[in-house]
Amino acid sequence: MKEKIKLIKGNIVDQEVDAIVNAANSSLIGGGGVDGAIHKAGGPAIAEELKVIREKQGGCPTGHAVITGAGNLKAKYVIHAVGPIWKGGNHNEDNLLASAYIESLKLADEYNVKTIAFPSISTGAYGFPVERAARIALRVVSDYLEGSSIKEVRFVLFSDRDYEVYSKAYEELDK
C-alpha cells in the first residue's frame, strides 16, 4: 500500500489532515521537539484532555498511543504515540517503535480517520537511528494499510536529512 504513503518536508503542525500524530512521552506531559510544537500550536485544550487521561490511566506505556482533540490545529485529532528511547538496539526498541505506529493507526481506524500525518517517532531526543526508524515506520505502515480504510498517510519530516533518509527507505520499500 505504498501508494497511500506520502513524504513531505515541513512542519507537522501545518498539516490539514484528520489526525496528527504526536511523538509523546510516557507521562503525556508536553516536552520539546514535535511534542512541544504540537502543544504550543494546539493550545491548552490538548493538555487539558491529556490531564484527564493521566488521571484515569496514569501515563501511556511505550509502544502505545492515546487520542485527544486537536485544539487549534487544522486536524480533528491528535494521536499521542510513545516511542522507545534508543538504548543500543537490544532492548526491544524495534518492536516498540513498530507498536507505536500500529497502535496509532488502530486508533485512527477506530475514529474513522482517513488522512493522518506522522513525524519521525523516537529519532529526536530519544536517539533512535533515523535510517533504522524510517525502514521500520514505512514497512509497518505500508503493511497495516492493506486492511485499513485510511486513504493517506503522510510522513512529515522537519529536516532535510530526515527527508532524504525517508525518501531512500521509501524507494527500497518494495525491494
UniProtKB/Swiss-Prot annotation:
Top-level lineage group:
Bacteria
Give the Pfam families listed for this entry. Macro
Residue ranges of every copy of the Macro domain listed in the record: 1-174
The record's listing under PROSITE patterns reads: MACRO
InterPro entries registered for this protein in UniProt: Macro_dom, Macro_dom-like
Q: Show the CDD domains listed in the entry.
A: Macro_OAADPr_deacetylase
The UniProt entry's coiled-coil ranges are: none
So what family is this one in?
Belongs to the MacroD-type family.
**What's the protein here called?**
Macro domain-containing protein TTE0995
